[in-house]
Amino acid sequence: MMRSPALLRLALATTSAIILSGCVTLLPKTKPVDLYRFGEAGAAVSASAPTGTVGVFRASSLFQREAGGDQLVTITAGKVAYLAETRWVAPAVVLWDAAVLTAFDADPGPTRLISRGEAGKVDYVLRLDVRNFEARFDKGPKAAPTVVVRVRASLTSGSNRSLTGERIFEAQVPATDNRVSEIIPAYDRAVAEVLKDIVVWTNATAVPC
């Protein structure tokens, strides 16, 4: 028996609708990811550069490999994991670089940080290797963690590359609770504490040439 073109079109449309409906229901459902940042807890940036500025070039540095991306690293009983459904708004290494610049710009001391491609007389070269940037659950997975930021700083002469000084800086800031909303502020405080000490040390070590 011959079927009319209208009936055939209706049958095809119905079949297509069923197929599309099935495709929609098969798509995985993903939970929204919360985005956070750190490094904005510093003082306001100074409006003018201090007199007698010492030019310090910020050299390329290392960052803890597993923590350099946009995921938050946790350590529990020696096991490395990432906080679920939580991300930095940008890779941690990018936020760290911005925080370093902000810390030096906000300080009224003699040091002026010079970034790659920026003009200026280089008196010293500063290297900051971030060895640890993580939340440690030392008291168990259900307890509030401690955020650890550990940085190795080295300062060398801009003229002959001789080592002027080096030091390890570390901050351990306990979160007030085992919640992301309390862990993020601990990161902010740890970063601010370490950078404050680094700026003070750099100002004291990088004497005018």
Predicted regions and their residues:
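Bacterial N-terminal signal peptides that target proteins for export
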Residues: 2-12
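C-terminal motif of bacterial Sec signal peptides marking the signal peptidase cleavage site
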Residues: 19-22
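Surface-exposed short loop/turn segments
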Residues: 24-43, 107-159
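A structural "domain/chain start" motif
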Residues: 24-94, 204-209
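Short secondary-structure boundary motifs at beta->alpha junctions and helix caps
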Residues: 79-87, 159-200
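Sec-exported extracytoplasmic/periplasmic mature domains
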Residues: 101-109, 135, 199-206
